[in-house]
C-alpha cells in the first residue's frame, strides 16, 4: 500500500494523503514499525546502555524489554537504579522486568540477595513492566513464600510475569501457568512451544549469541499460533550485532525459512507490544508512537533508516544523534 504517513508531536497523526511542513519521499521502500526485543540482558552485550543503543538502533530496534539480573546479582538494588537512570533519554525505549532470582541459586555468592520487599517499590516506575524470568521453578512448585509473594504482588500491580522453564513436565508447566506466568523464552523444541501456547502463554522465539533456537522453532509456526509468538535475543554479543544485526536478524531468518514477511514483522513489533501491554507502539497507525524502520525490501530487510518518536535517529547503518 502506497500512502503518506503523517507525524506530529512524536506520534503518527494519520495515514492517507497529507501535506507536511517537512516531507520525505521513500517511494519503493517499506516502512515497518520499530523492532522490539522482548527479552534481553544488556549486560551480556558487554556494553553500557548508551553504547548498546548506538549498536542496535541503526538495525531498527526502537524498544527492548531488559532483565538486569546480571548487574543486580552483584550490586543489588543499586544495579537496578543505575540501569533505570542510564537508560533515560536514549533513542531507544528501555523497559524493565525486575530480577526474580537474586542470587540465581541459593549457593551463589555474587554479592546481593533481594526478597520481594526489596524490589516491590520499583513497580511504581513507568518503565517497569513486571517480574523477570522466574528461574526458581522448584521453589514455585514447592510454594516458597518469597517466590509466591513476588508473583502475587506483580499480578496485583497489573504487571507481567516472565517464565523460565526449560524441559519441565506438563504438570509443572500447568502450575507455572496457573500461578500467572505469561511467557517463556526457553523453548528449544516445537513440542515445548506448542505446550506453552496451549496453556495461554506467549512464546519468545530466541536467537541470541549463546542460545540459537529460532531454526528449531520456526517449523512449529502456523497461521493459528503466530499471534502468540514474538522475538527475543536474550543476549547479543557486539560482534554478532555488527555482523548480523539485532531483532532484524530474527525477522530475516523467519522470512528466509518461509514465514510470511508481514507475520514475521508482526512478531517483532505488535505481538511483543501487546504481550507486555505497550498500547502506544507496535504498529503504523494513528495515535501510535512514530517508531519506524525503513527497509529496502521484505526479503533481505536491509535497514536504511530508523525513527524514534518521529525523530530520524539512524541512517545507512550509523547514528545521526549524539549520545
Where are these regions (language model features)?
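Divalent metal-coordination and catalytic microenvironments
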Residues: 10, 28, 39, 60, ...
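Divalent-metal coordination cores built from histidine and acidic residues
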Residues: 53-158, 224
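Histidine/acidic residue-rich metal-binding segments in metalloenzymes
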Residues: 113-133, 139-205, 211-232, 242-256, ...
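Active-site microenvironment of metallo-dependent hydrolases
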Residues: 1-3, 8, 16, 57-59, ...
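Di-metal (Zn2+ and/or Mg2+/Mn2+) metal-binding site signature of metallo-dependent hydrolases
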Residues: 29-53
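Histidine-rich, glycine-flanked metal-binding segment
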Residues: 1-33
